[in-house]
UniProtKB/Swiss-Prot annotation:
GO molecular function, one term: structural constituent of ribosome
Record's protein name: Large ribosomal subunit protein bL19
A Gene Ontology term for the protein's cellular component: cytosolic large ribosomal subunit
Name of encoding gene: rplS
Keywords from the UniProt entry: Ribonucleoprotein, Ribosomal protein
Domain of life: Bacteria
GO BP field: translation
Stated role: This protein is located at the 30S-50S ribosomal subunit interface and may play a role in the structure and function of the aminoacyl-tRNA binding site.
UniProt record similarity statement: Belongs to the bacterial ribosomal protein bL19 family.
Length: 115
């Protein structure tokens, strides 16, 4: 059981401007990157490998292919470093965690699109 003060602080920090997405969906995450004294937005485009719903501590992992190598990055859903999330394609998958996609290449790595 959490303290009421902790719940109040967590509730105020939860973001409501982010779209709903599920594992398998192709998304673009725009996040703020700080390099020295400059700030810019960098896009990370891939599909959602897993999603963890834990209130303020929610997180999701996005996987993309970069120069033939698989790159995975885990984001905190309610992080202030995330500028925006856009859903490119919705997927029709039957699993909550798509870890099996790590070992697939080529046509086998395709995900069926939801119509």
């Amino acid at each position: 059981m959490k303290n009421k003060f902790v719940e109040l602080v967590e509730k105020s920090q939860i973001r409501t401007d982010l779209p709903e997405f599920n594992p398998g969906d192709s998304i673009t995450v725009n996040l703020w990157i700080k390099e020295g004294d400059k700030q810019r937005i960098q896009a990370f485009k891939g599909f959602v490998l897993r999603k963890r719903n834990r209130g303020l501590h929610s997180a999701f992992t996005v996987r993309k292919m970069s120069s033939g190598m698989g790159v995975e990055r885990t984001f905190q859903t309610h992080s202030p470093l995330i500028d925006s999330i856009t859903v490119e394609k919705r997927a029709d998958v039957r699993r909550a965690k798509l870890y099996y996609m790590r070992g697939l290449t080529g046509k086998a790595a395709r995900i069926k699109e939801k119509v």
